[in-house]
């Protein structure tokens, strides 16, 4: 079967079964994440970049995500016996002239840390970097608690999402009007 991470699928088909397949593609890694973002914003988004605070990505962010399509992405800890997690932010420039930022954290040590995630819309065009990561991580992020969360993102957009609590995490997000 073809690799899923780094691809675009129909937004309506995004779900846990697809994200489980993305996790499986990452192999036997103790800290990893499969991410799906469904674009139901009414406009398109174009990938800017991914910034990894810890860990890495094996695939490139899908470049162009039309309305009613979902992007699939993944991250994992660095290979080898290293005490790192998969912690990052990535950014998409939206056709409305603003930037969609997504942050996720799958830590190495669950004695001190938990899974966290957040989504934010930034005015204008902004690449993901340490500042964007910190803005969302230290802002008011959602815990990866196996529960659905939603909020108003501003600019006429809403977000609904869920992240699992495991070291092999799934993050599913829907951006809508």
Curated annotation (Swiss-Prot):
<feature type="region of interest" description="Plays an important role in the hemolytic activity">
    <location>
        <begin position="3"/>
        <end position="12"/>
    </location>
</feature>
<feature type="binding site">
    <location>
        <position position="138"/>
    </location>
    <ligand>
        <name>phosphocholine</name>
    </ligand>
</feature>
<keyword id="KW-0800">Toxin</keyword>
<keyword id="KW-0166">Nematocyst</keyword>
<dbReference type="Pfam" id="PF06369">
    <property type="entry name" value="Anemone_cytotox"/>
</dbReference>
<dbReference type="GO" id="GO:0051715">
    <property type="term" value="P:cytolysis in another organism"/>
</dbReference>
<dbReference type="GO" id="GO:0015267">
    <property type="term" value="F:channel activity"/>
</dbReference>
<keyword id="KW-0964">Secreted</keyword>
<dbReference type="InterPro" id="IPR009104">
    <property type="entry name" value="Anemon_actinoporin-like"/>
</dbReference>
<feature type="binding site">
    <location>
        <position position="133"/>
    </location>
    <ligand>
        <name>phosphocholine</name>
    </ligand>
</feature>
<dbReference type="GO" id="GO:0090729">
    <property type="term" value="F:toxin activity"/>
</dbReference>
<keyword id="KW-0204">Cytolysis</keyword>
<dbReference type="InterPro" id="IPR050677">
    <property type="entry name" value="Actinoporin_PFT"/>
</dbReference>
<feature type="binding site">
    <location>
        <position position="105"/>
    </location>
    <ligand>
        <name>phosphocholine</name>
    </ligand>
</feature>
<comment type="subunit">
    <text>Octamer or nonamer in membranes. Monomer in the soluble state.</text>
</comment>
<dbReference type="GO" id="GO:0006812">
    <property type="term" value="P:monoatomic cation transport"/>
</dbReference>
<keyword id="KW-0472">Membrane</keyword>
<comment type="similarity">
    <text>Belongs to the actinoporin family. Sea anemone subfamily.</text>
</comment>
<dbReference type="GO" id="GO:0042151">
    <property type="term" value="C:nematocyst"/>
</dbReference>
<feature type="binding site">
    <location>
        <position position="107"/>
    </location>
    <ligand>
        <name>phosphocholine</name>
    </ligand>
</feature>
<feature type="binding site">
    <location>
        <position position="87"/>
    </location>
    <ligand>
        <name>phosphocholine</name>
    </ligand>
</feature>
<dbReference type="GO" id="GO:0046931">
    <property type="term" value="P:pore complex assembly"/>
</dbReference>
<feature type="region of interest" description="N-terminal region">
    <location>
        <begin position="11"/>
        <end position="30"/>
    </location>
</feature>
<comment type="function">
    <text>Pore-forming protein that forms cations-selective hydrophilic pores of around 1 nm and causes cytolysis. Pore formation is a multi-step process that involves specific recognition of membrane sphingomyelin (but neither cholesterol nor phosphatidylcholine) using aromatic rich region and adjacent phosphocholine (POC) binding site, firm binding to the membrane (mainly driven by hydrophobic interactions) accompanied by the transfer of the N-terminal region to the lipid-water interface and finally pore formation after oligomerization of monomers This toxin shows hemolytic activity.</text>
</comment>
<keyword id="KW-0812">Transmembrane</keyword>
<dbReference type="GO" id="GO:0044218">
    <property type="term" value="C:other organism cell membrane"/>
</dbReference>
<keyword id="KW-0406">Ion transport</keyword>
<feature type="binding site">
    <location>
        <position position="137"/>
    </location>
    <ligand>
        <name>phosphocholine</name>
    </ligand>
</feature>
<feature type="binding site">
    <location>
        <position position="54"/>
    </location>
    <ligand>
        <name>phosphocholine</name>
    </ligand>
</feature>
<keyword id="KW-1052">Target cell membrane</keyword>
<dbReference type="GO" id="GO:0005576">
    <property type="term" value="C:extracellular region"/>
</dbReference>
<keyword id="KW-1053">Target membrane</keyword>
<dbReference type="InterPro" id="IPR015926">
    <property type="entry name" value="Cytolysin/lectin"/>
</dbReference>
<feature type="site" description="Important in the initial contact with the lipid membrane">
    <location>
        <position position="113"/>
    </location>
</feature>
<protein>
    <recommendedName>
        <fullName>DELTA-stichotoxin-Hmg2b</fullName>
    </recommendedName>
</protein>
<dbReference type="GO" id="GO:0046930">
    <property type="term" value="C:pore complex"/>
</dbReference>
<keyword id="KW-0813">Transport</keyword>
